[in-house]
Amino acid sequence: MNEDEQVRPQEIHQAIGEASNYLMEHGFALTAGNLKKVLLAQDILSTEPRQKTVLSLARQFLKQKIHGDN
């Protein structure tokens, strides 16, 4: 997959879904704040530029949904 290729919405939703699964499996509350923390931790641990982009966009998506689509 080309790194310059546009990130698909499915990739963002998958990243959020994986973060949700992590929170549920470990007994943490499923909140937007916790999701953003998990996505940030995954971003820090990731070494793949494309995955970092997907995770960053997923955090931005959650932030927009929390604060409204301005």
Language model segments and positions:
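N-terminal acidic leader/helix
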Residues: 1-29
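Short acidic DE-rich linear segments
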Residues: 1-3, 67-70
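Short, charge-rich amphipathic interface segments used for partner binding and complex assembly
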Residues: 34-67
